[in-house]
Regions:
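Short, low-complexity N-terminal intrinsically disordered segments enriched in polar/charged residues
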Residues: 1-30, 130-132
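A beta-strand edge to alpha-helix "cap/lid" segment located at domain peripheries
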Residues: 1-4, 59-132
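Hydrophobic pocket/interface hotspot
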Residues: 9-12, 24-25, 32, 54-55, ...
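Poly-acidic low-complexity segments
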Residues: 20, 33, 122-123
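A solvent-exposed, acidic/Ser-Thr-rich amphipathic alpha-helical stretch
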Residues: 23, 29-80
Length: 132
């Protein structure tokens, strides 16, 4: 079991929840693979390869789309350098539509830094929240 790896991932969720984005970015490797669903209706879709891209194209786009947004981790599965997190993405869009989507995040951590994050979402819930 890699407590340090799980702790790094837990810190991402804790700092995101507190709005401490710089602390989240501090544990991202300079070159990483952050993969979001490729669906056209998602403002943060695609693969992002730097902390700056994650900040702008993921966090920035989500915050521009939602009045309230949170990721809620429920279960952490430790697999050495990989941590699988089950949870939910929840929020209210600027149009007043609610999001409550099941999610699974697969993290890879090396030397205390996130080198990969692959996100799996209930895309129907996202589509409904974003498009009505």
């Amino acid at each position: 079991m890699s407590t340090q790896t799980v702790d790094v991932v837990r810190s991402v969720y804790a700092n995101f929840a507190k709005g401490e984005i710089e602390a989240v970015l501090a544990v991202l490797a300079p070159a990483l693979e952050w993969v979001e669903s490729p669906h056209d209706f998602l403002p943060h879709r695609g693969t992002h390869r730097t902390p700056a891209a994650v900040a702008g194209k993921v966090f920035g786009m989500v915050m521009a789309t939602f009045d309230e947004f949170a990721v809620v981790p429920e279960l952490f599965h430790d697999a050495g350098d990989t941590v699988v997190v089950e949870g939910r993405s929840v929020g209210t869009t600027k149009q007043g539509r609610r999001l409550d989507a099941a999610a699974c995040w697969v993290w890879t951590v090396r030397d205390g830094l996130v080198v990969a994050n692959h996100n799996y979402h209930d895309t129907d819930a996202w589509r409904t929240a974003l498009l009505g």
